[in-house]
Amino acid sequence: DDYSCGPFSGAARELKGNNECLNLTRPEIIKAIHKEYIAAGADIIETNTFSANFISQSEYGCEEFAGRMAHTGAAIAREAADEAAQMAASVGLERKVWVAGSMGPTSKSLSLSPDASDPSFRPYTFDDMYRAYRQQAEALIEGGVDILLIETCFDALNVKAALAAVSDCQSGREERI
């Protein structure tokens, strides 16, 4: 099974569908997908890190791997992008493929309660959400992304936490992401 080998051997929960696991168990598959997009003409490729944060990974019992999933996902995409640039240069061309670090909405909402009988209940705080996004953003930057892509978020508080985390990651960096 592609999902539950390597660091996930003996996982207590079903991991199929947790695509970020593939960054650690089958990086060659993820890289091949990036290369297909590049070969088709993509100038920007997204990392396989949409749910590589400890909140989303807690659904699978994989929260301890979230940072590693994000970093490795970025490094795989960076490698594919750099190889495309090298290949172009070998025939006298210049090509830049940008790597966008995918940051999804997490599996939890800060604005809505998952418990209809307790509308004030929230399983996570704003600070928890901020920490999840901060860890993910830092790992993506360290892995080599050019862009941080906060995507498909429907919850304004989740977006606010993500933007605060990304902004704080920029502090002290010479190069803006």
Predicted regions and their residues:
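Domain-level signal for soluble alpha/beta catalytic cores
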Residues: 1-177
